[in-house]
Amino acid sequence: MLLLALCAGSCTTNDVPTPDPTDADSLIRFDIAPCPGFGEVDTDGSPALSGGTSADRPSTRITQTPEAAQWEDGDILWIRTDFYNAAKELKTTYITALKRDGGHWRSLTDQEEEDHIAPCVAVRRFYKKEIRWPNELYGIPGIYCQIYARYLGQQYPDADGKIAVTPDIDVINISNYYSTFYPGEVAELRFYQPLTRLRITKACQLQFKSWNYTFLLPGFNEESGAYVPNDLQVPPGGEDYFFNPEYNYTISINGQKIQLLPDAQGSFKGMSYTIDPERLPSGPVVPEL
């Protein structure tokens, strides 16, 4: 079943002048695919994209169960749409947000916009509850729209459009921007896991280094951070942490150093490691595949 979040937009390649677009003409439909679970790779060894070809796709995102991951209510997808003319000149940029609610995606409510968008000077002039192709571009041959999407937990930007990315945030991307050219076309947003998941199952003292950075709206770019040490007290029920290691990577649990190994292609992206602090491994830990 397609998970369609309806935001308005339009596109045409018709040379004949057209009237102002109707709502039906201007809709951009987003197929929000589930994200692949950790440890899933394609045949070439790269992190697997979500979706595949099955019409009945399993959910694979954020409730981090041993079996699968699910999108959770409260999750937010930030979407940027760039509209170009036939000369490939950027003419208009819009930002929108889709929120998971009751097992479905919806636009932000008026109250959520008042609480979280209105105070954000950097975002509010680009923000649209529903994204529609600009009337001045509708019906012009050669126009197109590029779409970007990013998941950053359930966070909203601060007044400067910044969202902090720390080890408790699972960042999820689409692999490339999506281009749409035709009215009524469904934009299929397929996601992948760019980070590594470390699942600690019980209380312990955990230490590791990670890149902490800031995601910037509306530009959809990252502000360089620092490779910082993290000294964390894992709660009794355990916790998941997300980071981007490079080469061989070492963590410390209750003072014992543990080496994490990459997959056969030397990559940590999309890999998952589960460690029980009461049964620490005697050697390096390989990813779960």
Features from the language model and the residues they span:
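Sec-type signal peptide cleavage vicinity
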Residues: 11-289
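C-terminal motif of bacterial Sec signal peptides marking the signal peptidase cleavage site
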Residues: 6-10
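Sec-dependent signal peptide recognition
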Residues: 1-2
